[in-house]
């Protein structure tokens, strides 16, 4: 005889597979979560267990089997320069190559959301591959790439960085983001008063009014915490070292703590 727990699990799975609002990909994702959360929760110290049960801390619903990290920050520049033996890809020769390589690698970056959380410092990554393209030719490619990200990896946790320097790629990304007004990818502009020209900062401010992005990060402050250019802004309030990451994320419930 099935137990009440087994019956409840089957009912949740049945609701997922028969949902009229979930896509097949979303159904697969939520079914996998049900299987993962059917496993025992990892062992915790008594105080941590109590804090979790009382709602003082939140595990962000990362699942009972943390087999994948929350934040991974690949060295995308190295990948574009050298390619990947594992993926049988050569390094990029031009902007089309670079964009194609990134779209492939993004599907192999592990994360809790099953989508890449960090997309890279895109203007710095892509600018070396522009070669002889005009601004219009760059804009067309970036807009196509931006739309691809939203349609195939539709997750607002997905985060890209630009700045502090100005470049045709930087401007193209700002134009595409303002025009398309997509939820994803999320975007942070890294500002440095010694590097960022005033007219670029003004353009960033106009974009914020137009599409509520990008967020602005203080470059010099982060340079002191990490090394210059050796980090990524991976969410609205998290920065981590490049070629590193973070295994998990725990939030404090300040209201519960105060009570």
Model-identified regions with their sequence ranges:
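Conserved catalytic cores of very large enzyme subunits
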Residues: 2-259
């Amino acid at each position: 005889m099935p137990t009440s727990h087994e019956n409840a699990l089957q009912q949740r799975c049945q609701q997922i597979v028969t949902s009229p609002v979930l896509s097949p990909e979303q159904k697969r994702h939520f079914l996998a979560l049900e299987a993962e959360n059917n496993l025992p929760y990892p062992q915790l110290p008594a105080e941590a267990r109590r804090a979790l049960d009382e709602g003082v801390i939140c595990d962000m619903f990362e699942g009972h089997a943390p087999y994948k990290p929350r934040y991974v920050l690949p060295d995308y520049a190295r990948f574009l320069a050298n390619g990947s033996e594992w993926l049988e890809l050569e390094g990029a020769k031009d902007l089309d190559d670079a964009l194609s390589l990134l779209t492939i690698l993004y599907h192999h970056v592990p994360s809790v959301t099953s989508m890449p959380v960090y997309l890279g410092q895109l203007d710095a990554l892509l600018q070396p591959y522009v070669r002889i393209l005009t601004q219009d030719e760059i804009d067309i490619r970036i807009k196509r790439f931006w739309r691809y990200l939203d349609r195939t990896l539709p997750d607002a946790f997905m985060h890209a960085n630009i700045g502090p320097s100005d470049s045709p790629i930087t401007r193209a990304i700002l134009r595409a983001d303002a025009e398309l007004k997509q939820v994803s990818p999320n975007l942070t502009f890294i500002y440095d008063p010694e590097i960022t020209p005033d007219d670029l900062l003004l353009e960033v401010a106009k974009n914020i009014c137009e599409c509520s992005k990008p967020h602005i990060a203080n470059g010099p402050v982060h340079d002191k915490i990490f090394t210059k250019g050796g980090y990524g802004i991976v969410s609205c309030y998290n920065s981590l070292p490049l070629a590193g990451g973070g295994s998990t994320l725990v939030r404090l419930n300040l209201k519960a703590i105060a009570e």
